């Protein structure tokens, strides 16, 4: 068992120098090095009650994956993450950990919580850069499910179902999969090719089929999917893609953009 690191504060995240990043749109946060990740992981107390797990929307076994990092078993950590999430590199970057897992971390009572999101990101990035093995496809269970929308919820459902042996097809209205991950989060926060595209590729490797430029209700209907194409269930994850307006004068003037358009 690795020796605990009782530092009160997180290991700082390396970032682009301001004089460099003000001239590009590359990712600002650069991620932990191997040694930084191991050192930060050793701050985890592996609490008996695991409040961080209860606060995680997908119930990742956080202490277990962090313990693997602390013991320098990065692929073991990735295997634990993969049991609960198909998008660890995305979630490690953009999930609001401060309100979820890290918000409940015992280390945060006196000092800073463990950098759970940073460690999740490190594990996912390390696996992507060092492991070339495709995910193991489970045995098909003979059931067929349609997923409407290739945003984070659709990708998550598709990945989870594929791991259980379901034959899954995602129908996406736009020409690229990813939803808000592609169209709503800036490149400097979430790189599209380096991260999002690679996460989607992993979902495809599980056997999930993607059909883009398909508008449900126009190109086809839910009834047709179930009655004519043999889908036994449909998950609707169409997202909240339309911007909200305040209804004030000048909103439609030239040069006025919604938040969606701006991002």
Give the role of each language-model region.
Residues 76, 139-140, 144-148, 200-248:
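Feature captures the FAD/FMN-dependent oxidoreductase FAD-binding
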Residues 143-169:
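N-terminal Rossmann-like FAD-binding beta1-loop-alpha1 element of flavoenzymes
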Residues 114, 184-212, 251-262:
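N-terminal glycine-rich dinucleotide-binding loop that anchors FAD/FMN and/or NAD(P) in oxidoreductases
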Residues 86, 151-152, 176:
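Residue-level detector of alpha-helix initiation sites
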Residues 166-182:
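Glycine-rich FAD pyrophosphate-binding loop
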Residues 1-144, 236-263:
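Ferredoxin-type iron-sulfur electron-transfer modules and their immediate structural context
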Residues 159-160, 182-183, 246-250:
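Short amphipathic alpha-helical segments
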């Amino acid at each position: 068992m690795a020796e605990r690191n009782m530092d009160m504060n997180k290991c700082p995240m390396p970032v682009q120098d301001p004089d460099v990043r003000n001239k590009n749109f590359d990712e600002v946060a650069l991620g932990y090095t191997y040694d930084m990740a191991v050192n930060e992981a050793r701050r985890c107390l592996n609490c008996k009650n695991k409040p961080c797990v209860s606060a995680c929307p997908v119930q990742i076994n956080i202490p277990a994956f962090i313990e693997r990092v602390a013991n320098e078993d990065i692929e073991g950590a990735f295997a634990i993450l993969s049991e609960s999430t198909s998008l660890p590199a995305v979630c490690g970057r953009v999930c609001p950990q401060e309100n979820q897992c890290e918000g409940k971390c015992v280390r945060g009572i006196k000092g800073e919580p463990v950098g759970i999101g940073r460690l999740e990101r490190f594990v996912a990035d390390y696996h992507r850069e060092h492991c070339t093995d495709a995910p193991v496809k489970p045995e098909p269970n003979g059931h067929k499910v349609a997923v409407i929308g290739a945003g984070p919820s659709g990708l998550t459902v598709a990945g989870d179902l594929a791991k259980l042996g379901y034959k899954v097809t995602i129908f996406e209205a736009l020409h690229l999969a990813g939803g808000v991950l592609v169209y709503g989060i800036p490149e400097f926060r979430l790189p599209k090719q380096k991260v999002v595209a690679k996460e989607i590729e992993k979902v495809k490797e599980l056997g999930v089929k993607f059909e883009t430029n398909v508008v449900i209700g126009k190109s086809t209907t839910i009834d047709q999917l179930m009655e004519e194409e043999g889908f036994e269930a449909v998950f609707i994850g169409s997202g909240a893609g339309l911007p909200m307006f305040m209804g004030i004068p000048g909103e439609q003037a030239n040069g006025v953009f919604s938040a969606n358009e701006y991002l």
